Swiss-Prot record:
Family in the record: Belongs to the class-II aminoacyl-tRNA synthetase family.
Matches recorded under SMART domains: tRNA_SAD (SM00863)
Enzyme class of the recorded protein, top EC level: ligase
Species whose genome carries this gene: Burkholderia thailandensis (strain ATCC 700388 / DSM 13276 / CCUG 48851 / CIP 106301 / E264)
Alphabetical list of PANTHER family matching this protein: ALANINE--TRNA LIGASE, CYTOPLASMIC (PTHR11777:SF9), ALANYL-TRNA SYNTHETASE (PTHR11777)
UniProt: Zn(2+) binding residues: 564, 568, 665, 669
UniProt cofactor(s): Zn(2+)
Record's GO cellular component terms: cytosol
E.C. code: 6.1.1.7
Alphabetical list of PROSITE patterns matching this protein: AA_TRNA_LIGASE_II_ALA (PS50860)
Annotated protein name in UniProt: Alanine--tRNA ligase
Length: 874
């Protein structure tokens, strides 16, 4: 049974049991800033389990794309060397949100494994938490698993509830026992059952974990039963595929075999068991899907992890003899294997390929030199019998050649060598480098709020009377009142304030009553449906239970709405002008501007920018109405609405039709496109490989910008004594005049240099049959210096010459040596002798070289030393 069929059967089985098939969420978590990557099926449901979000279904099933590389969950260094470690994997799961519990979860799992997948029942073992008698009895008395194949696992990690069979979301919150299902590969494979001293062997392999969330743990460690217990299960697709395909390594399943063959094709390796091929096959999955989800190789956070994975794959290809870009060519093979299950991969194929190719080209520019340095160091270390690589060298490889520390460590590990990481860290600190380790994401200080959700009125109103204060927070702690001068977060039962999301900034404004006034500087979400008003109490005392009038800064909101609506129109215009590959990769919409990041591999031309502006302004002039509808997500997407990168959507979504644009959006917008007034792009540039950024302004900001531009044009025209309409023509005339004058100046300099050259030739000193000359040529540029050196070489026949010129505190140097003398006196060495004394460096051919410097005060002494330097070499 192939992996694709296993995935399909899993989802269809649970759909037949009343579960809603929910699409895989992004690898970039939209609801958990503490998590680097989505690493399990439950991540997208975390807020549901915590009660902060509701869904229209109580049963769900998913095939979740997951990554474990960086931070707490880091499998990177093991990938390729073990049978079951991966950076990217698929987690099959079924979930119950207060619906069914242990009995159904266990029966469903058993039915799927034994009836649908047809695994022999006598090959399956199960574990339960040691005091979970309920689960034990279901397995033993209802399912019929013999007692000798049911193992109770106690607290085996040093504390109460610290067990492989007790799951906890964190130090507090939902938790509960779990039951794991193992497959027995038989006595031909070494290993013992779970809980035994030999449990780390490969005979008994965990294939499914059933988590029963039935408790809530408070800060004191007390456990209370949840009113609605939940189920969260996870089964790795690669693991169950290995079992069903009767192989012992995940890399032997059909999906990986095709990618390994493709890796062998691109690297020219015949041995398909080579570990480096496994590394490459694994890494193309992680890298491709991370790029699909908007991650771009970089030097921080997620981008840094992606860069590490890409470079690790490249290094293994290099190890196999591939000295040029190859990794990006595997994207097509991955699409062939997984494109049907994940259409987003196929849609992004060209973009993924381009990003990987660019990253490869960048790395291959430095890898050969860096690898040669590392190989030489390891050879020296081996000769000396050493086992630890100098941390300073590891840092040099990182700083100069772009080798992440773990890449250097990976190479060393293959030679039985470790890296002196403390020394590396010391070097990093001294250099004050900003490259950060992958897991340093900082969680925003959470506010513990358990009340009702906030009712948002901001789509219709700019103010709400009699809003009730339901919670107050000062420095993250819940308080009963706030005094004048204190900064706080206020939660209301009703508000017109929009909380920052979807790239749009939060509202500002005022909360006030007869006795108090609270200035709102920002509005952020405390939970999915709970809005926090951040600011300072300017007067009075504000207490929980007080009623206030909540009023936003309407002018600021209007400017923000104009920019947000213009962003939608610009997005559509960019797709029309550049192509359908354009996808939003980030945005910031505030009252001053809109900043829009999107997937595209080339700078926009002036013509493309003008076309985008024209299309958007045409939509503005059409004064089309903005129409908002709420509908199921699937219906919205089928109807042509665009879903945007980084956004987390529920099953009911808000669709905005604005002119020719249709997008899913929860932000605030203009009522008609004409309200935008005027649209103007003011900046365009690149922010990462394959990602461009456009900044634009609207309304009164755009009018002021155009007026200022007009004023500058008028001022420039006046300075050139021309009418504004004649400015381009006049600039052309001035440029022609400048070129003519530069040509005339060059001729004069050449004539002057020629006459000076005749005089300089007389200053040459003969040393060992070679004329040596070191002098300053006043007013000469680099071209004049070179021409003069050539003339002097012709005149003197056998010579070693250094000429210098000083301009604006900078030294220019040219050295020339005739062919007969260049075997002993090389121009590159000669010019560097002088350059080092004037704060510079240079180089070139044995007969001609140039250099520069920044310390002209040292030039006379440096030139005076040339005669002796040449004399030593003749």
């Amino acid at each position: 049974m192939k992996a694709a069929e296993i995935r399909e059967k899993f989802l269809k089985f649970f759909e037949s049991k009343g579960h809603t098939i929910v699409r895989s969420s992004s690898l970039v978590p939209g609801n958990d800033p503490t998590l680097l990557f989505t690493n399990s099926g439950m991540v997208q449901f975390k807020d549901v389990f915590l009660g902060a979000e509701t869904r229209p279904y109580s049963r769900a099933t998913t095939a979740q794309r997951s990554v474990r590389a960086g931070g707490k969950h880091n499998d990177l260094e093991n990938v390729g060397y073990t049978a079951r470690h991966h950076t990217f994997f698929e987690m099959l799961g079924n979930f119950s949100f207060g619906d069914y519990f242990k009995r159904d979860a266990i029966h469903y799992a058993w039915e799927l494994l034994t009836t649908v997948y047809k695994l022999p029942a006598d090959k399956l073992w199960v574990t339960v938490y040691h005091d979970d008698d309920e689960a034990y009895d279901i397995w033993a008395k209802e399912v019929g698993v013999p007692a000798e194949r049911i193992i109770r696992i106690g607290d085996n990690k040093g504390a109460r509830y610290a067990s492989d069979n007790f799951w906890q979301m964190g130090d507090t919150g939902p938790c509960g026992p779990c039951s794991e299902i193992f497959y027995d590969h038989g006595p031909g494979v070494w290993g013992g059952p779970p809980g035994s001293p030999e449990e780390d062997g490969d005979r008994y392999i965990e294939i499914w974990n059933l988590v029963f969330m039935q408790f809530n743990r408070d800060a004191q460690g007390n456990m209370t039963r949840l009113p609605k217990p939940c189920v969260d299960t996870g089964m790795g697709l690669e693991r169950i595929a290995a079992v069903l395909q009767h192989v012992h390594s995940n890399y032997e399943i059909d999906l990986f075999q095709q990618l390994i063959k493709a890796s062998a094709r691109e690297t020219g390796v015949a041995d398909l068991a080579n570990n480096s091929l496994k590394v490459i096959a694994d890494h193309i999955r992680a890298c491709s899907f991370l790029i699909v989800d908007g991650v771009i190789p970089g030097n921080e956070g997620r981008g840094y992890v992606l860069r590490r994975i890409v470079r690790r794959a490249i290094r293994h290809g290099y190890k196999l003899g591939r000295k040029g870009p190859f990794f990006h060519k595997l994207v097509a093979d991955l699409v062939a294997e997984m494109g049907a299950a994940y259409p987003e991969l196929k849609e992004a194929e060209q973009r993924v390929t381009d990003v990987l190719r660019q990253e490869e080209e960048r790395f291959f520019e430095t890898i050969e030199h860096g690898m040669s340095i590392l190989e030489a160091a390891l050879a020296d270390l081996d000769a000396a019998g050493g086992k630890t690589l100098d941390g300073e060298l590891a840092f040099k490889l990182h700083d100069t050649y772009g080798f992440p520390l773990d890449l250097t460590a990976d190479v060393c590990r293959e030679r039985g060598v470790t890296v002196d990481e403390p020394a590396f860290d010391d070097a990093m600190a001294r250099q004050r480098e900003q490259a950060r380790a992958a897991g340093k994401f900082k969680a925003t200080q959470g506010l513990e709020y358990t009340g009702a959700k906030t009712t948002f009125h901001g789509y219709e109103e700019i103010a709400f009377d009699d809003a009730k204060v339901v919670a107050l927070y000062v420095e993250g702690a819940s308080v009963g009142e706030v005094k004048a001068g204190e900064s706080a977060v206020v939660v209301l039962d009703h508000t017109p304030f929009y909380a920052e999301s979807g790239g749009q900034v939060g509202d500002q404004g005022v909360l006030a009553n007869a006795a108090t006034r609270f200035a709102v500087a920002d509005t952020l979400k405390v939970q999915a449906d709970v809005i926090g008003h951040h600011g300072e109490l300017e007067q009075g005392v504000l207490k929980v239970g007080d009623a206030v009038r909540a009023e936003i800064d309407a002018a600021r909101r209007a400017r923000t709405a104009r920019n947000h609506s213009a962003t939608h129109l610009m997005h559509k215009a960019l797709r029309d002008v550049l192509g359908s590959h354009v996808q939003q990769k980030g945005s910031l919409v505030d009252a001053d501007k809109t900043r829009f990041d999107f997937a595209h591999n080339a700078p926009l031309t002036d013509d493309e920018i003008r076309r985008v502006e024209a299309i958007v302004n045409e939509q503005v002039l059409a004064n089309a109405p903005g129409i908002v509808r709420v509908m199921p997500y699937d219906d919205a997407v089928k109807g042509g609405a665009m879903a945007l990168f980084g956004e987390k959507y529920g099953d009911e979504v808000r669709v905005l039709d604005l002119g020719f644009s249709r997008e899913l959006c929860g932000g605030t917008h203009v009522h008609r496109t004409g309200d935008i007034g005027l649209f103007k792009i003011v900046a365009e540039g690149g922010v990462a490989a394959g990602i461009r950024r456009v900044e634009a302004i609207t309304g009164d900001n755009a009018v002021r910008y155009v007026q200022a531009l007009d004023a500058r044009v008028n001022a420039a025209a006046a300075a050139l004594k021309a009418q504004p309409s004649e400015l381009i023509q006049r600039i052309g005339q001035v440029q022609d005049q400048v070129k003519s004058l530069e040509k005339e100046l060059g001729a004069l300099k050449s004539k002057l240099a020629s006459s000076q050259g005749d005089e300089l030739a007389q200053q040459a000193v003969e040393v060992g049959g070679v004329h040596v000359l070191a002098a300053t040529l006043d007013g000469a540029d680099a071209k004049t210096l070179r021409e003069t050196v050539d003339k002097l070489k012709d005149k003197l026949k056998s010579a070693a010459i250094v000429l210098a010129a000083v301009d604006g505190g900078k030294v220019s140097l040219i050295a020339g040596v005739t062919a007969d003398a260049s075997k002993k006196v090389k121009a590159g060495e000669l010019v560097n002798f002088v350059a080092q004394q004037v704060g510079g460096k240079g180089g070139g051919r044995p007969d001609m070289a140039q250099a520069g410097g920044t310390e002209p005060a040292n030039l006379p002494a440096a030139l005076a030393g040339v005669k002796g330097w040449v004399e030593e070499r003749l």
